[in-house]
Amino acid sequence: MSAAPEGRRMLRLEVRNAETPIERKPEWIKTKARMGPEYQALQQLVKTEDLHTVCQEAACPNIYECWEDREATFLIGGSQCTRRCDFCQIDTGKPADYDTDEPRRVADSVRRMGLRYATVTGVARDDLPDEGAWLHAETVRRIHADNPGTGVEILATDFSGNPDLLAEVFSSRPEVFAHNVETVPRIFKRIRPAFRYERSLDVITQGRDADLITKSNLILGMGETREEVSEALADLHDAGCDIITVTQYLRPSPRHLPVARWVRPEEFVEIKAEAEAIGFLGVLAGPLVRSSYRAGRLYAQSMSAKGRELPASLAHLADPANGFAQAVG
């Protein structure tokens, strides 16, 4: 059996996936690169200060727009995950030792970058007794303490649905608690074998019950049907999800799940209208939308739709700005 780039042996599933060549993207999937002054300043700062964000390391297509708005995403808990999802670029393996200084370093990067809004996401750490709950919570707390004008969104694993571990994360009071369901029940176990669809919905419900703004994401093109997308949207809204993002699956490498279909822009328009009609407070949909795309602006819109005032320190998130270039209208 051949080896993966990280040196480990490829799984049988990965070998089977690799039999299908990487698909050619349709003409409507194009990045709109607008390198404004804020983006250029941040790019130079990140380079000279040797800072690290998911944005540049994952070559996110939305980096130009998000950085222009002083938003960025950070990965905590290491570069390897204890779980494997068939769409995810992060490799599976034994994670690095627990780094208790990481929250301070992330908060310092947020300060030096002058971010208006930071998204923090982490790998699953099933090897730890608390599955990384303290690390998630402490990173949010440290960013808030060191950067009072910065909003924080936590994009978390499910922590096995454990209420005590989730309560630790909730206690840090992020502006948004996000947990991505990603796909529909019929194909969920095949694509995300270490997660459970109903458990993920319950995690979102627990976030709602903690009086947090909640968020999730659906990736299309992994084998779902259009009807199943509608059913998943209804499930998420019933679970208490406030914000939903919907995107196209783009295959990270030949080892990953082949693309089942390319969703046309008009279908994203239809899905966005459907999600808004269901009652989601914030909806972004489009081939290149990602769950952290323009997250601060979407949070501000959702707070307004919920009838809540933004904290005075975060009022700037509602300032007029360019629209969501990568999302359908």
UniProtKB/Swiss-Prot annotation:
The keyword Cytoplasm applies. SUPFAM superfamilies: Radical SAM enzymes. [4Fe-4S] cluster 2 binds at C81, C85, C88. Its cofactor is [4Fe-4S] cluster. Binds 2 [4Fe-4S] clusters per subunit. One cluster is coordinated with 3 cysteines and an exchangeable S-adenosyl-L-methionine. GO terms for molecular function: 4 iron, 4 sulfur cluster binding; lipoate synthase activity; metal ion binding. The keyword Transmembrane does not apply. Keywords: 4Fe-4S, Cytoplasm, Iron, Iron-sulfur, Metal-binding, S-adenosyl-L-methionine, Transferase. Gene3D superfamilies: Aldolase class I. Its main location: cytoplasm. GO terms for cellular component: cytoplasm. It catalyses: [[Fe-S] cluster scaffold protein carrying a second [4Fe-4S](2+) cluster] + N(6)-octanoyl-L-lysyl-[protein] + 2 oxidized [2Fe-2S]-[ferredoxin] + 2 S-adenosyl-L-methionine + 4 H(+) = [[Fe-S] cluster scaffold protein] + N(6)-[(R)-dihydrolipoyl]-L-lysyl-[protein] + 4 Fe(3+) + 2 hydrogen sulfide + 2 5'-deoxyadenosine + 2 L-methionine + 2 reduced [2Fe-2S]-[ferredoxin]. It comes from the Bacteria. It is found in: Cytoplasm. Belongs to the radical SAM superfamily. Lipoyl synthase family. PANTHER family: LIPOYL SYNTHASE, LIPOYL SYNTHASE, MITOCHONDRIAL. HAMAP family: Lipoyl_synth. This is Lipoyl synthase. It comes from Clavibacter sepedonicus.
